[in-house]
Amino acid sequence: ALIGGSIGGGIAWEMAALAPELTQYLIPIASDWKANDWIIANTFLQKRILQNSKNPIEDARIHAMLTYRTPQSFDYRFGRTKNEELGIFNVESWLLHHGNKLANRFSLPSYVMMNHLLSTINIERDGKSAKKIIGSINAEIHLIAIDSDLFFTPSEDQRTFQMLKQKKENIYYHELKSIHGHDGFLIESDHMAQILKTIF
C-alpha cells in the first residue's frame, strides 16, 4: 500500500502515476493529486517568508501552523488564556514553540525544498490529463479528506472522486470529522484507525 498524509499523499499520487501497477492500495490522506491555487498561494507566501525573514524557518512555520488548524481548534485548545510567565497569549507561546522546534530540526535548504515539492504536486504530464492517468492506476484508491481542512480542502477530493467514479470502479471517498483542520489526521488517530480498518 502507498499511504501518505499531506505532502506524503502528494508523493504517493506521483509514485502511483509513474508506476500504475506499483501498489494494491493508494491512500492519500489530507492531500490531492495537484497543488491547486490555494496551495500555490500559501507556498508562495512561505517562499517569500523564507527569502525575506530574519528568522525564516520559525516565521514560515508560524504561518504554516495557521493553515494546518482552524479557528475552532484554537478556541478549543487556548480559549484566549495567557502565559503569565511570558506575558503573552498561550496561542502565541504555542506558535513560537513550534517555530523554534522546527528550526532545530530543519535546515533552511531542506525547508525550501519541502515547500517547493508541496507547491509543485501535479501528476499531469506529457499532455495526459489527471483523469486518464488516474484511470490507468490499477490500485484501489481511497481518498481520505478532513471535513474542516483549510489547506487541502475536502472539496478538492470530492471533485476528484466525482470526476473518476464513473470511469474507475475501485475508487472510494472517506471523510474524517474533526475540528482540528489539516492536522486532524495526526490528532484524531482513533478515527483514522477506524477508517483504515474499513479498507484493510
Task: For each feature predicted by the language model, list its residue ranges.
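Alpha/beta-hydrolase-fold enzymes
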Residues: 22-101
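Active-site nucleophile elbow and catalytic-triad environment of alpha/beta-hydrolase enzymes
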Residues: 97-98, 113-133
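Substrate-recognition/cap regions that form aromatic- and gly/pro-loop-enriched pockets
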Residues: 130-134, 148, 171-174
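Conserved hydrolase catalytic core segment
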Residues: 1-37
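Catalytic active-site module of serine/aspartate enzymes centered on a nucleophile-bearing elbow/loop
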Residues: 158-200
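Conserved alpha/beta-hydrolase "acid-adjacent" motif
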Residues: 150-159
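Short beta-strand/loop motif that positions the catalytic acidic residue
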Residues: 137, 143-145
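Short, conserved loop/helix-junction motifs that constitute active-site signature segments
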Residues: 134-138, 164-167
